[in-house]
């Protein structure tokens, strides 16, 4: 269950600074974003937000992560590089502070040997929202840390973030 999505915000916000304010409205009309600008001079209150345009957020997430945060594990005799979920979480908080994540489904295989978690990560920029989904599957008999659902969720979360470019270079390093 992998998916891609882009949705324009159907919201209105006002940025006030200096002598005037700029009001910006977003709506979707048949998938096309419409901007409306107006100038206001009443109620001038300086405000600032933490949001940025999606292009800026994605540019930051696509940067190579430092080697110091990369971990390695051996799986089926192969060495695999990865970024722990809690580090991915901190990177998301730093570069996309208004992101959200949600478990979309938890599915056990018919034989009960594996569990798959589908996870969605949504980024909220000043201009739009965008989401990516991915899945993680693990054996219920895996004796490592945590339970199988936690492992599958962490895997799905990391993969969904990689769909935004975060740590994506790890998947291609060996091929270069």
UniProtKB/Swiss-Prot annotation:
Return the transit peptide range from the UniProt record: 1-37
Is the keyword DNA damage in the record? yes
Q: Supply the alphabetized keyword list.
A: DNA damage, DNA recombination, DNA repair, DNA-binding, Mitochondrion, Nucleus, Transit peptide
List the Gene Ontology MF annotations in alphabetical order: cobalt ion binding; double-stranded DNA binding; single-stranded DNA binding
Q: Where in the cell is it found?
A: Mitochondrion; Nucleus
Tissue specificity, per the record, is: Expressed in root vascular tissue, tips of primary and secondary roots, young leaves, hydathodes, stomatal guard cells, cauline leaves, flower buds, stipules, carpels, pistils and anther filaments.
Report if keyword RNA-binding is assigned: no
Q: Which GO terms describe its cellular component?
A: mitochondrion; nucleus
Database matches in InterPro entries:
RAD52-like, Rad52_Rad59_Rad22_sf
Q: How does it assemble?
A: Interacts with WHY2.
* Main function: Plant-specific single-stranded DNA-binding protein required for efficient heterologous recombination-dependent DNA repair in nuclear and mitochondrial compartments. Forms large nucleo-protein complexes with WHY2 in mitochondria. Binds ssDNA with high affinity, but with little sequence specificity. Involved in double-stranded DNA break repair. Involved in the hydrolytic splicing pathway in mitochondrion. Facilitates the excision of two cis-spliced group II introns, NAD1 intron 2 and NAD2 intron 1.
Q: Which family does it belong to?
A: Belongs to the RAD52 family.
* Protein name as it appears in the record: DNA repair RAD52-like protein 1, mitochondrial
């Amino acid at each position: 269950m992998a998916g891609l999505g882009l949705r324009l915000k159907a919201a209105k916000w006002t940025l006030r600074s200096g002598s005037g304010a700029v009001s910006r409205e977003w709506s979707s009309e048949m998938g096309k974003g419409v901007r409306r600008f107006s100038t206001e001079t009443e109620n001038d209150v300086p405000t600032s937000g933490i949001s940025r345009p999606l292009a800026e957020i994605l540019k930051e997430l696509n940067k190579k992560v430092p080697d110091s945060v990369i971990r390695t594990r051996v799986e089926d005799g192969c060495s695999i590089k990865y970024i722990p979920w809690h580090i991915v979480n901190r990177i998301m908080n730093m570069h996309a502070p208004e992101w959200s994540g949600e478990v979309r489904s938890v599915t056990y295989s018919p034989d009960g040997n594996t569990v798959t978690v589908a996870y969605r990560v949504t980024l909220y920029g000043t201009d739009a929202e965008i989401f990516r989904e991915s899945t993680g599957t693990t054996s219920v008999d895996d004796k490592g840390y945590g339970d199988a659902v936690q492992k599958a969720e962490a895997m799905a979360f990391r993969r969904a973030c990689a769909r935004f470019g975060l740590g994506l270079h790890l998947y291609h390093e060996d091929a270069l």
